[in-house]
């Protein structure tokens, strides 16, 4: 007899309207090691039996803060200069929103003494490593693109809002939209 461990050990939905499978997958970059680490955090929350929604949210917070943010910071460290990699996440997190415009990123960059071209370089590298995605503002429904979902995706500064990966919003103390 096959057993669906997700349905057996986890709540069916999170926040009332998200199916737990989709919710958990959106916290990762669809990499096996991300998924394994998330499930390790879920296992740490277990006290026996089905996990509560609160236990899942606690696991999400630990995964976000103690794993995914550090992984993304390590990736960016190899793509940006030391100076830019030190301020990249602080600048984006200082916007205090899950979705933000290029103009908001420029204003945040000014607070960190970044030139506009530095802000673009940071956003490009954050996009390439999956920290941010782009939401198309020109079409109906606002199609969202993340590089890890579409490896052929190209960074843009036109007609888009940037969206912070759901998996690191807890680490940034930013509410999900």
Regions found by a protein language model. Give the residues of each.
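Short amphipathic alpha-helical interaction segments
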Residues: 112-129, 134
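Short, amphipathic alpha-helical interaction segments positioned at domain boundaries
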Residues: 145-177
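Winged-helix-like regulatory helical subdomains adjacent to P-loop NTPase cores
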Residues: 17, 25-116
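Short, Lys/Arg-rich nucleic-acid/phosphate-binding segment
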Residues: 136-143
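Generic signature of intrinsically disordered, low-complexity, basic-rich segments
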Residues: 81-84, 125, 163, 167
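The catalytic "switch" region of P-loop NTPases
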Residues: 1-17
């Amino acid at each position: 007899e096959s057993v669906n461990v997700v349905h057996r050990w986890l709540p069916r939905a999170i926040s009332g309207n998200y199916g737990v499978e989709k919710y958990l997958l959106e916290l990762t970059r669809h990499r096996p090691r991300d998924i394994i680490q998330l499930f390790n955090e879920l296992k740490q929350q277990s006290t026996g039996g089905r996990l509560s929604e609160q236990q899942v949210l606690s696991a999400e917070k630990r995964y976000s803060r103690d794993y995914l943010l550090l992984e993304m910071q390590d990736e960016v460290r190899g793509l940006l200069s030391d100076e830019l990699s030190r301020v990249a996440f602080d600048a984006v997190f200082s916007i205090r929103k899950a979705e933000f415009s290029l103009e908001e990123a420029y204003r945040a960059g000014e607070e960190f003494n970044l030139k506009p071209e530095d802000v673009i370089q940071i956003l490009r590298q954050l996009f390439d490593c999956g920290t941010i995605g782009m939401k198309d503002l020109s079409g109906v429904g606002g199609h969202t693109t993340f590089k890890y979902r579409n490896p052929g995706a190209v960074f843009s500064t036109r007609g888009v809002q940037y969206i912070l990966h759901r998996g690191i919003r807890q680490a940034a103390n930013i509410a999900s939209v």
